[in-house]
A protein has these predicted regions:
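Residue positions within transmembrane alpha-helices of multi-pass solute transporters
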Residues: 8-9, 39, 62, 93-97, ...
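Glycine/proline-centered helix-kink
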Residues: 65, 86, 91-103, 157, ...
Length: 378
């Protein structure tokens, strides 16, 4: 429910960001996320928790939809790469620390504290946003919000994510096929409507820019490859070579740690090296690490796994900062929100596709699914 809420709301909220200002959308997102976190913790039924998670997803989507647009607004053009690098660093830290912090909370308290911890953090973030975020950007030429486009967007991407999730969870093939067919039909009319809009909610105007569309495609592929590895490897580590859950978590940690190191460095290097060259180098290093993982010996040592995981994370970090920089900077300034929303959508589509592919490969190849997934990711 949380992920679907995010993916259906990213583009409409980024459109509103271009229309009314990124600062306003970001602050609203913080307020909604904080309040709904409290409601999640106080939920007394699964239905109430599900509804609260949907609302929380809308708040999270507001934050994601204008995040990189705000970075572009805050940083001077010559230092935009550093801003993207810092943002990628924060994402990597969250990915590395989140599961560990969640496990620590659950070992000491009830599940409600997974949501309650967001409340003080959210309140602090709201005050910081009010104090430090720059004023709303000047209004763009967008004069109205097209509700039919938002509904068609929600149905198209909602059905796509639901179909991918259902496929990964082994739902009826007929149900998944029906969802895909419905998605294609609605998506066709959605795209046709966007092509007639002066400022489209689905940024087809930006997708006509070759470097923008190429960067979006590579972003989807990179997150798909990441999920192919990060979802399939735990099965291999625990089922095939018998590592414990704690050991598995530690062996996966070099990936985000290496990303934490490389992402800000890549952001700095953008000022000196062409972003396309940095991104290509990052993808090459990541691919080498993934192929190395696919060729693991039958009884690998911890070091065998660690030295292969590290280049995966390093390459991922070296790619993300310049690629995100290219996506945002290639869009006109008044369409930064659309570029930011498309970047978040690409990430979620890549992650969902990767998880669905892992399920398919394990159904087809059994225990050797990890090997196939890593080869495909590379």
């Amino acid at each position: 429910a949380y992920q679907i809420a995010i993916v259906i709301a990213l583009l409409p909220l980024s459109f509103l960001g271009d229309m009314v200002g990124y600062r306003r959308i970001y602050k609203i997102g913080l307020v909604v996320f904080t309040i709904t976190s409290l409601i999640c913790a106080l939920s007394r039924s699964l239905e109430m928790l599900t509804l609260a998670r949907v609302a929380q997803g809308l708040g999270g989507a507001a934050l994601m939809s204008v995040n990189t647009a705000l970075i572009r607004l805050i940083y001077p053009k010559r230092q935009l790469g550093r801003g993207m690098g810092i943002n990628s660093f924060v994402v990597a830290v969250s990915s590395a620390a989140g599961p560990t912090i969640a496990a620590a909370i659950l070992s000491l308290a009830s599940w409600q504290w997974l949501f309650l911890i967001n409340v003080p953090l959210g309140i602090i973030s709201i005050f910081l946003a009010m104090r430090f975020l720059p004023p709303n950007s000047a209004a763009s030429k967008i004069t109205r919000f097209d509700l039919p486009s938002a509904i068609m967007n929600a149905l198209t991407f909602g059905l796509l994510i639901t179909a991918l999730g259902g496929f990964a969870q082994g739902q009826s093939g007929y149900l998944v096929l029906a969802e895909v067919i419905a998605m294609l039909i609605i998506g066709f009319f959605f795209v046709r409507r966007q092509l007639r809009m002066p400022v489209p909610l689905l940024p087809v105007d930006l997708l006509r820019i070759p470097i923008f569309s190429l960067s979006i495609c590579t972003s989807i592929c990179s997150f798909c490859a990441q999920m192919l590895a990060m979802v399939s490897l735990p099965f291999f580590l625990q089922t095939v070579i018998g590592r414990s859950e704690v050991e598995t978590g530690l062996l996966l940690t070099p990936w985000p740690l290496a990303t934490m190191v490389m992402a800000p460095l890549a952001g700095y290097l953008i000022e000196k090296v062409h972003a396309g060259l940095l991104g290509a180098m990052g993808l090459l290093i990541m691919a080498c690490g993934l192929f190395g993982l696919a060729l693991l010996p039958s009884s690998p040592s911890d070091l065998d796994i660690i030295w292969r995981m590290a280049p995966c994370g390093a390459g991922f970090g070296l790619f993300q900062s310049p690629n995100n920089h290219t996506i945002v900077s290639s869009a006109p300034a008044h369409r930064s929100g659309g570029a930011s929303g498309m970047l978040g959508t690409a990430r979620l589509l890549g992650q969902s596709s990767g998880a669905a592919l892992v399920a398919l490969l394990f159904n087809l190849a059994g225990d050797s699914g990890t090997h196939t997934a890593l080869l495909l990711a590379g």
